[in-house]
């Protein structure tokens, strides 16, 4: 009742209670205006404009634990993502955590979709693995943090070792990502297809490709839900007022992960919407910050 009322703009007063204003999640225009400082280093892992990754590196000698940041935006460039995650990257770097802020080709860019989007994310993470020593990064302490569409990609990236050998996305030595924080994620391309279509106007076929004789199951190498178990711990954080990826989607995915034998938990944040999950000035940030520090075995602040 409370969530529905807030979404409709009502204030509900029950007997014996005091009227309070409903939470107001950050609006899209305000989210798109969010910017963080410039990264310490920028790498181009391909020739396309979106094939870049940014490094926010802490001061000091290192080696530093790493948070791989994969922004969302309905797999479409008009919704931004990279600039907004710069603020989180800079905040993490100030705490001694390196942030690897990944950009990738999206559905409305040449080469985006299946398989290009996945290849971009995988390549960006492979760059981290191959350059970690020179950049003073500790790949034994890694967490992937993805928001919305980026959560789908982060969970997929952590499961790359489970890719069918015949898949064009398969790699010989994928970086182990022991923990993934999914923020308002849409991780199950098969069962979340309707939610993805309603929220993003995207047909999941653009994200999975079409089946053929050599690849009859298009989810086997694109959807993390079909790549379980994968020895990854999942923490699914969702705003109570998230209308794009409602908390029940996270709960269903967590149940599926647990049923497969991997650890997972769901966290619902009161008074937070979908875009609040990706900004510092929100009820989500303190929980996200504490979660990142927890999985990287850093002391609580």
How should these model regions be labeled?
Residues 23-61:
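N-terminal cap/lid segment of alpha/beta-hydrolase-fold proteins
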Residues 27-32, 38, 48, 191-226:
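Mobile cap/lid helix-loop segments that gate and shape the active-site cleft of serine hydrolases
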Residues 112-133:
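Alpha/beta-hydrolase active-site loop
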Residues 126-194:
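Primarily recognizes the serine-hydrolase "nucleophile elbow" in alpha/beta-hydrolase
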Residues 236-238, 242:
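Short beta-strand/loop motif that positions the catalytic acidic residue
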Residues 243-252:
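Conserved alpha/beta-hydrolase "acid-adjacent" motif
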Residues 272-282:
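Catalytic histidine-centered segment of alpha/beta-hydrolase-like enzymes
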């Amino acid at each position: 009742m409370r969530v529905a009322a807030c979404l409709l703009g009502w204030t509900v007063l029950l007997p014996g209670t005091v009227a309070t204003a409903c939470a107001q999640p950050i609006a899209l225009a305000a989210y798109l205006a969010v910017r963080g400082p410039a990264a310490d280093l920028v790498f181009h892992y391909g020739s396309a404009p979106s094939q870049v990754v940014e490094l926010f590196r802490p001061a000091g000698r290192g080696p530093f634990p790493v948070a791989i940041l994969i922004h969302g935006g309905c797999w479409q460039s008009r919704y931004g993502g990279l600039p907004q995650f710069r603020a989180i990257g800079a905040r993490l770097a100030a705490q001694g955590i390196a942030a690897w802020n990944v950009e990738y080709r999206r559905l409305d860019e040449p080469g985006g979709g299946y398989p290009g989007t996945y290849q971009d994310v995988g390549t960006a993470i492979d760059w981290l693995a191959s350059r970690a020593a020179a950049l003073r990064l500790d790949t034994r302490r890694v967490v992937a943090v993805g928001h919305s569409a980026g959560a789908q990609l982060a969970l997929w990236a952590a499961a790359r070792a489970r890719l069918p050998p015949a898949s064009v996305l398969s790699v010989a030595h994928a970086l182990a990502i022991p923990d993934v924080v999914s923020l308002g994620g849409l991780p199950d391309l098969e069962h979340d297809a309707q939610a993805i279509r309603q929220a993003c106007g995207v047909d999941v076929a653009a994200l999975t490709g079409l089946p053929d004789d050599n690849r009859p199951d298009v989810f086997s190498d694109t959807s993390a839900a079909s790549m379980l178990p994968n020895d990854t711990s999942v923490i699914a954080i969702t705003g109570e007022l998230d209308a794009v990826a409602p908390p029940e989607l996270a709960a269903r995915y967590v149940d599926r992960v647990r049923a497969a034998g991997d650890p997972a938990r769901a966290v619902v944040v009161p008074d937070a919407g979908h875009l609040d999950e990706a900004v510092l000035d929100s009820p989500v940030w303190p929980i996200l910050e504490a979660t990142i520090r927890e999985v990287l075995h850093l002391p609580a602040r």
